[in-house]
Amino acid sequence: MSSTDASTETSTQEVGTVDMRLEVVTLPVSDVDRAKRFYQSLGWRLDADIAAGGEMRLVQMTPPHSACSIHFGKGFTAMEPGSLDRLYLAVKDIDAAREDLIARGVDVSEVEEQPRPPGLPDVPGRSYFAYALFRDPDGNGWLLQEITTRLPGREWED
């Protein structure tokens, strides 16, 4: 496996100027109502629940303070239920986020801290290198990732 110094690569990369923001991620689920109950139990906002006949249904939900939502439903993805893994949720305090999810009845792994690879800019605390995993009822995997300070270049200027 090879690695690239991202700070060198990004300094020479031509960055796009068109404003593009990730809006929605589609989750494959087997039971729409069960998934809706699960994500509501996490405290996620229900944005829409739209049915078109008996063949199509779309539910949109948004995690607290997130600019990106999730879609799931019936009749609009060929992905196998539970096939998405490593969907990241950035949190400022991973221990508090983990405790909140456990209090809501979610099975969450212990917090795992990864060593900081050499060559990355230093950020305080465990930013980017502390994780905890949980799964929805279909097995789609979510990673809590603690980020208290963004790495240089990770903030877009308005």
Regions found by a protein language model. Give the residues of each.
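Short beta-strand segments
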Residues: 68-70, 142
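Helix-adjacent hinge/juxtasegments
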Residues: 73-96
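Residue-level recognition of conserved beta-strand positions in structured domain cores
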Residues: 63, 72-74, 146
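Short, solvent-exposed beta-strand edge segments and adjacent coil->beta transition regions
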Residues: 19-24, 82-86, 129
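Short loop segments at secondary-structure junctions
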Residues: 29-30, 64-66, 91-94, 137-139, ...
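Short, small-residue-rich loop/turn micro-motifs
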Residues: 63-65, 76, 112
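Core segments of cupin and vicinal oxygen chelate
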Residues: 16-20, 26-68, 96, 103
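Vicinal oxygen chelate
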Residues: 1-18, 50, 59, 89, ...
